[in-house]
Amino acid sequence: MAIDFKKKLASRTITSKTNPIELYGTLDRKSVAGPLRPAQEIVLSEWYTKRRTDRDLIIKLHAGEGKTLVGLLLLQSLLNSKEGPCLYICPNKYLVRQVCSEADKFGIPFCTFGESAEIPNDFLAGSKILITHVQKIFNGRSVFGTDNNYIKTGSVLMDDSHACIDTIKSAFTISISKSENPEIYSKILTLFNDDMIEQGEGSWLDIQTGDYNTFMAVPYWSWNNKKTEMLRILSATQEKRQIYYTWPLMCDQIENYCCYISGSKIEISPYNVSIRTFGSFSYATHRILMSATIQDDSFFVKGLEFSPEAVRIRCGTKNKNGLAKKC
């Protein structure tokens, strides 16, 4: 008797339902996976009926309410609606493994980066959710590209978004440790020496003797006047780990950066983060942030360029005081 392999393969694929609650019922779940929790059903139902077409969405689910599964179901729903490629972003590699384990447990198709740096074809084709970590996307040498040369995405979800914020900010920051890169540190101190003496001679002496608790900002006019010399120093040492991933982001934007010097390190950071540099996130059709705690609303608007309406009206369950807003 001939075996119908097509039929067997078809039985292992997800029925193309777009309602995430109905979709959950079609998954090839392992026996340990039970029904959806009430909190999950609330969020999924209200997203599907009220916020499905929103470009920007913030979901707040308290610890233990199963936000990982909610995120995976939302992205699978969007994939089934042909709104891929879909990207699930975690704050670190450890949580990537956790999310992959959840996806496997619930029978949701996913892919990850293998040993090579190539973006998986299953992601590009819109057939599987790509699960990765925030550093993979937000760096000056990102495999997803920067500026006008970026990989187009349909839907991007950032899990534990509050934990991702610091990583995104640090992607634009060069931090030069005196202990790891004494030569670069010394060259920069020499470059700004005269101007820093004028700013505060005593504090500058403390910095030169290695005082960890003293730091000074390079005056904007001094930074602007010596930006070419500064670029030469950084360009010549851009292969250093502390410079390598940030250099492409700041090399043509140095006038929009500022510099702080302490006895232990030099930090060069922008006045404002330019999230549009990362088009795979910035220009996605749908952008979803998930978190158990949201403390830095201002960065969602100013940094990630989320709409104020998305910050004001969040999707989630009420807290014990009944204060959290729902969709």
Model-derived features: where do they sit?
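Conserved pre-motif I regulatory segment
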Residues: 2-60
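Conserved coupling segment at the C-terminus of the helicase ATP-binding
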Residues: 25-28, 41-42, 48, 52, ...
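Conserved SAM-binding loop
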Residues: 36, 88, 130
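Conserved Walker A/P-loop ATP-binding site and its immediately adjacent core
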Residues: 63-115, 136-139, 296-299
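Conserved catalytic network of the ASCE P-loop NTPase/AAA+ motor domain
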Residues: 79-81, 122-124, 147-151, 279-282
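A short beta-strand-to-loop transition that corresponds to the Sensor-1 phosphate-sensing loop
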Residues: 92, 128-136, 160-161, 290-294
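Conserved motor-coupling elements within RecA-like helicase/translocase cores
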Residues: 105, 116-130
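Internal, well-ordered domain-core segments that constitute the primary functional module
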Residues: 116-118, 131-138, 148-163
